[in-house]
Amino acid sequence: MIRKNSYKIFWLAGESSADLHSELVMKALNDKFGNLTHIGIGGPRMQRQGLKPIFPFDKFAVMGFVEVVKHLIFFFKVQIRLSKLFSTEKFDLAILVDYPGLNLRIAKMADEMRIPVLYFICPQFWAWKHNRVYQLRDSVRYVACILPFEEELLKIHNINCSYIGHPIAEEITFELDRDSFARFFGLDSSKKWIGFFPGSRNNEITKMLPVFLQAAKKWNQNEYQILFSKSHNVNHQLYMHLIEGQKDIIIIDGYNYEMMKYCELLVCTSGTVTLEAAYIGTPLVICYKASYLSYLIGRKFVRIKRIGLPNIVLDSDLLPELIQGEMNPANIYKAGMQILTDPEMNTKIRKELFKLRAMLSNKHPSIEMPKIVRHLFETYG
């Protein structure tokens, strides 16, 4: 039974994917509980649902060990500010979304100040930094898992948790059919389309886009048309500078899901976009390249052999993964053409991706999260 008429929730979502995944959840919470106050860190989507931001969202978009080290002073200031905020504001709940490098520290801080913590999108302790599972156990009241296998792993450590479905099952919609998409962007419908997704962070774009552009040149322009996604989170001037002088490519700004659906093949930087593409059902090549130091440090601690989320969820080497030195134009073209020209391989990939879709869509976060929040309000409110 809900005991109060209004509740105050602290949020921390440090990345664009977390901002996206939190939007529908916030809307569902607002619809369910009505009088909620949302304060914290989040992007434009969360702000549309009523979040009052306390830091510029774009300051948090860093990736890799070296990049994080460069921003240590900023993150130290964030922790000081949040410590003061927690001591002055009466929060009924803290919802921390992914972003474990900072969020696990904030979870400990909130717990020490008697603010119950709900962790939405579990840290990938099963991949690396296994000690994070103990941080979850000590500081977090409940973990909402978005990958099917995480619930069982957490319960081994006596952590309150449940699998709530993956947010992409609710987020992915299509506004344009193939012909409308082609007309909107001036595409040649008679050709096969190959789509490149170089990333949603500036440092990703700097590393991945030049390699992807070189790979794109290898495809026969008479048979294939090359599409490049441009994330709204990426600095426009940086992106345009990197593609300056490139011919025979079409930049797709927005309509990512249509691009994924209507392309014959996708080449994607490792991340949420690979799971979105796999959920939609289009075969893809997964690529990843970090700074050399970040890669060396990461390789020492990573506990799994796969980096692509679709392969991890399926526990399979279904989709080709090109990492660091292997991520070069020749290998991208070779892996992509193998998928395009081998009907048996192509069919197998599509069948397995259909299974993945079923695994991720049997529950919905916008339905499950309000149940969890209600339970926490009733227990700790």
Annotate each PLM feature.
Residues 1-381:
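Nucleotide-activated sugar donor-binding and catalytic core shared by glycosyltransferases
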